């Protein structure tokens, strides 16, 4: 982090006019640190003489609302595309999670909710990228079949999404912000439970206002009880939302914003 922030501050001080210095912000970094010094350093970056572009409109506190535009992060829809159908595999329902080491990602909290489900019959848990051994053992002790997938490419990640009937893409901070696992799993034709965009921008019955263990448990049970027509309607609604996040469209939006800013 030290070298990242050092480079960042040096860049801000380069003898280039402010109109040509931009800061594309995908997260409010202050939330990611417990150490007060790192929080302070991260917070100072938002006061640098840079033109701020956000990937979600409500990403920063109001004191930093001097951004010049909002450009959502893009999704490669040639890679993240829907599976042929939302059929159950051998009578089982697969639930997927992108596991992360960072505590604010909420992986352990999600696993706690899964372990507390009353009806665990026929559920397979698929976890990609990161899984602590203690959490794996908790899932096994609860009676789940658990599969772990180390992901090394976007193609593998997209395949992972498509292998699941349900994706849980929730976190503990920045409710409503753009979230790659949420967007990518929506594009891949999964039922998605999330407190992040793009799902929170829809009328989905599976969107959450914030992380809440009880609400998450209710959403999982709702997924498990949807009929085929309800599943299809939810999935098609998710897929239709993703068109505006296609890389081509996002790239054109970003380019137009930069051209206007330099006039």
Task: Give a label for each model feature.
Residues 31-53:
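Membrane-proximal helix-turn-helix segments that form the acceptor-binding/catalytic region
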Residues 33-36, 69-92:
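Acidic anion/phosphate-binding donor-loop and adjacent secondary structure
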Residues 86-105, 111-116:
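Conserved donor-binding/catalytic core segment of Leloir-type glycosyltransferases
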Residues 135-155:
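Nucleotide-activated donor-binding/catalytic signature segment of Leloir-type glycosyltransferases, i.e.
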Residues 162-177, 190:
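Acidic donor-binding loop of glycosyltransferase active sites
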Residues 187-194:
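Short hydrophobic beta-strand element within catalytic cores of glycosyltransferases
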Residues 228-262:
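A charged, aromatic-enriched C-terminal amphipathic alpha-helix characteristic of glycosyltransferases
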């Amino acid at each position: 982090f030290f070298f990242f922030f050092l480079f960042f501050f040096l860049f801000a001080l380069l003898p280039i006019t402010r109109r040509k210095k931009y800061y594309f912000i995908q997260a409010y970094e202050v939330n990611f640190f417990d150490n007060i010094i790192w929080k302070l350093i991260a917070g100072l970056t938002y006061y640098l003489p840079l033109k701020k572009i956000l990937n979600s409109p409500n990403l920063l506190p109001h004191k930093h609302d001097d951004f010049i535009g909002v450009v959502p992060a893009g999704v490669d829809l040639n890679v993240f595309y829907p599976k042929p159908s939302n059929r159950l595999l051998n009578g089982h329902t697969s639930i997927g999670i992108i596991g992360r080491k960072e505590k604010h990602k909420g992986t352990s909290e999600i696993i706690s909710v899964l372990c507390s489900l009353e009806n665990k019959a026929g559920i397979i848990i698929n976890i990609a990228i990161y899984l602590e051994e203690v959490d794996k053992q908790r899932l096994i002790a609860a009676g789940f079949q658990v599969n772990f997938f180390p992901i090394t490419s976007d193609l593998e990640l997209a395949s992972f999404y498509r292998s699941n009937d349900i994706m849980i893409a929730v976190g503990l901070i920045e409710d409503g912000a753009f979230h790659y696992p949420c967007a990518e799993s929506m594009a891949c034709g999964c039922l998605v439970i999330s407190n992040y965009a793009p799902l929170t921008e829809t009328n989905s019955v599976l969107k959450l206002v914030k992380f809440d263990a009880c609400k998450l448990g209710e959403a999982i049970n709702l997924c498990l009880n949807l009929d085929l027509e309800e599943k299809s309607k939810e999935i098609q609604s998710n897929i239709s939302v993703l068109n505006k996040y296609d890389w081509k469209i996002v790239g054109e939006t970003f380019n137009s914003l930069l051209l206007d800013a330099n006039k």
